[in-house]
Amino acid sequence: MAGAKEIRSKIASVQNTQKITKAMEMVAASKMRKSQDRMAASRPYAETIRNVIGHLALGNLEYKHPYLEERDVKRVGYLVVSTDRGLCGGLNINLFKKLLADMKSWSDKGVETDLALIGSKAVSFFGSVGGNIVAQVTGMGDNPSVSELIGPVKVMLQAYDEGRLDKLYIVSNKFINTMSQEPLVVQVLPLPPSDDGELKKKSWDYLYEPDPKSLLDTLLRRYVESQVYQGVVENLASEQAARMVAMKAATDNGGSLIKELQLVYNKARQASITQELTEIVGGASAV
C-alpha cells in the first residue's frame, strides 16, 4: 500500500492548494469590485478636464501651449503601469510585449526611449531585459493615490518641458470586463487632436479667470496626472479580474487532478487487494 499512501498524500496536498486558490479567487473578486468603483469615480474628472482643455485651446488660438503642439520626435517617454504582485495570468507579459513592439517601431526610426515604471513587475522585467529607466515607484497597494504617482509624472513632464522628450505615452491595461483586459499604449503629450466639431457643438457655461494661458499651464499638468491615475486604477481592476480568473482556473484544474489521482488510487488499492487475495489463496492451496 506504499503507492496508495503516496497517492493519498498527493490528493491531500492538491486539496489544500485548492482551498488557497479558492480563497484567493474570492478575495480578488471583492477587490475587483472596489477597484471598479474607484475606476468609475475617477473617469468623469479626467473627461471633464479633457473637455475644458479642448475648449480653451479652441477659444484662444493666439496662444498654443507646448503640450498641444507637435514637434520633431527624437526621444519618446513611456509611463508604464504594471502590477506589484503576480498570479494574474498573462496580464503583465502581454502589456510588456505590446510596449516592446511600440519601442521597436520607434527604435527602427532612430528614436530613443525613456521609461518611468509603476509597479514591481515592470521594474523587475526591464531590469532584466534592459531599458533607460528614469523613474520608478512600487508598493502602492490596492488603494493608490495621485500623490504616490507625482514622482514619475514630474520626472517625465520636466523632461518634456526641457525638450528631452518629444512624446509621452501611458502604457496600461484597460478593463473591459471580468474576462477581458486590453493592453494599451496611449499618447498623452502632445495632447492628441480631438474632434473640434464636436466640441464646438457643445454648450459651454464657463467664465475663465485670469486667462487661458494660466489655466492651461495648471490644467494640462492635472490632465496628465489624472490620466496616469486613471491608468493605474484601471490596471488594478484588470489585475484583480485576471487574478480571479486565474485562481478559478487553478481551482478547477485542481478538481480535475484530484479526480485523476482518485482513479489512480482506486486502481492501486484494487491491485493491492487482488495481490493479497492471490497470496492467501496460494498459501491455502499449499497447505
From Swiss-Prot:
Q: Name one GO molecular function term.
A: ATP binding
Q: Which family does it belong to?
A: Belongs to the ATPase gamma chain family.
Q: Which SUPFAM superfamilies match?
A: ATP synthase (F1-ATPase), gamma subunit
Organism of origin is Pectobacterium carotovorum subsp. carotovorum (strain PC1)
**Membrane-protein topology:** Peripheral membrane protein
Q: What name goes with this protein?
A: ATP synthase gamma chain
The protein's matches in PROSITE patterns, at most eight in alphabetical order, are given as:
ATPASE_GAMMA
**Superkingdom of the organism of origin:** Bacteria
Q: Which GO terms describe its biological process?
A: proton motive force-driven plasma membrane ATP synthesis
What cellular component GO annotations does this protein have?
Answer: plasma membrane; proton-transporting ATP synthase complex
Where in or outside the cell it occurs: the entry states:
Cell inner membrane
Keyword Transport annotated: yes
Q: How does it assemble?
A: F-type ATPases have 2 components, CF(1) - the catalytic core - and CF(0) - the membrane proton channel. CF(1) has five subunits: alpha(3), beta(3), gamma(1), delta(1), epsilon(1). CF(0) has three main subunits: a, b and c.
List UniProt keywords, sorted A-Z: ATP synthesis, Cell inner membrane, Cell membrane, CF(1), Hydrogen ion transport, Ion transport, Membrane, Transport
Which PANTHER family is this protein grouped with?
A: ATP SYNTHASE GAMMA CHAIN (PTHR11693), ATP SYNTHASE SUBUNIT GAMMA, MITOCHONDRIAL (PTHR11693:SF22)
General function of this protein: Produces ATP from ADP in the presence of a proton gradient across the membrane. The gamma chain is believed to be important in regulating ATPase activity and the flow of protons through the CF(0) complex.
A Pfam family recorded for this sequence: ATP-synt
